[in-house]
Amino acid sequence: MTIHIYNTLTRQKEEFVPLEENKVKMYVCGPTVYNYIHIGNARPPMVFDTVRRYLEYKGYDVQYVSNFTDVDDKLIKAANELGEDVPTIADRFVEAYFEDVTALGCKHATVHPRVTENMDIIIEFIQELVNKGYAYESEGDVYFKTKEFEGYGKLSHQPIADLRHGARIEVGEKKQDPLDFALWKAAKEGEIFWESPWGQGRPGWHIECSAMARKYLGDTIDIHAGGQDLAFPHHENEIAQSEALTGKTFARYWMHNGYININNEKMSKSLGNFILVHDIIKQYDPQLIRFFMLSVHYRHPINFSEELLQSTNNGLERIKTAYGNLKHRMESSTDLTDHNEKWLAEIEKFQTAFEEAMNDDFNTANAITELYNVANHANQYLLEEHTSKVVIEAYVKQLETLFDILGLELSKEELLDEEIEELIQKRIEARKNRDFALSDQIRDDLKERNIILEDTAQGTRWKRG
């Protein structure tokens, strides 16, 4: 079964054939680290971490690069407002980013390059563009000469005449054409800066990714990915810079994930309708948030609400409960062989259907449907009077494998009997104090861990589900 990817560049699904057999070069645009990320910012890391995991499952060696923009107008503004320097703020929010996305099940990239650690190659890249006639200096700034690049607009599918019609030169800009964009910005008084052939300054946003992608992955990469808001102008400008310099295709497959909406309106810091990952993972299990995000195809928008999150949690718990029941039945199962082939054949069908979904442009929504199907089928098998260890192990292994591909975990560490008794005692005390909210919370927490409570006249009994 071959993998097909929807390529933004061609607006169609294409068979995925990497440049090098069994190797994938993948670049995902990372955050500007001036604040905590919101759940809209967290969607690309989760989506493309899942893409990476599936490619690795299929046997590819994935070189996964995701950058940090650690110098930028937003960082400079934050530094001025807080009375701190830019590196201090950047370091703080790089660490916060790692805490958030690690909680959400994302693996670290092969490389996480930072702009400030790659200034030499960025300046060199700009100088080469100037030498080739694709860029020009203007009073300390350097701009890309868009009209010199014939393919401009091909990613966003916009004719250059239409783009130019809607563009304008802002006050203070020193460019020749409204579509020209900054590669290097002259430093203003009091701003952080680096020395360059054009004077003191810092790079523009777009050039950073082109330079770092080239350094770590080469002139041509297999997959370039990010949120759909980056397609224009950021990714369009990356293509122009990179292909003008090398004369080669910059990226062969372009992937873009959809927005997250709050009440049908795009979530963004500028609108103030955002939910920080830093906050929501204190309220909800990060694994639930990831499962919720993957329940929708990555190119589709997600309308976020706590009601939908709770509904998704119910489904996730059904799968986890089935898994827990399978694990507990393992002990009492036998080496029975009757009818094994029938059940094992059905299990294999679920595996095939899961892979077919993922091969179809990483359709995690359909893949998760197969997780529900596995759980439902396993529950039917558990109704059998006698169960086979071989079949039970096949269900368990399949659920573990599929969850791992999606970056999800199936179970928390099992509670010891003494820990359960302690929690029951706390619940009894809470009920005596008429703290029914705490009592219910303890009961629900135990239920999530597959511990069922039964209140009787003789006291509270418990059993593993």
UniProtKB/Swiss-Prot annotation:
Residues that hold ATP according to the record: K269
Reaction equation(s) it catalyzes: tRNA(Cys) + L-cysteine + ATP = L-cysteinyl-tRNA(Cys) + AMP + diphosphate
Motif extent ('HIGH' region): 31-41
Keyword flag RNA-binding: no
Modified residues (Phosphoserine): S270
Details of cofactor binding: Binds 1 zinc ion per subunit.
GO cellular component terms given for this protein: cytoplasm; cytosol
Annotated positions binding Zn(2+): C29, C209, H234, E238
HAMAP family: Cys_tRNA_synth
Subunit structure: Monomer.
Official protein name in the record: Cysteine--tRNA ligase
Record organism: Bacillus cereus (strain ATCC 14579 / DSM 31 / CCUG 7414 / JCM 2152 / NBRC 15305 / NCIMB 9373 / NCTC 2599 / NRRL B-3711)
Lineage: Bacteria, Bacillati, Bacillota, Bacilli, Bacillales
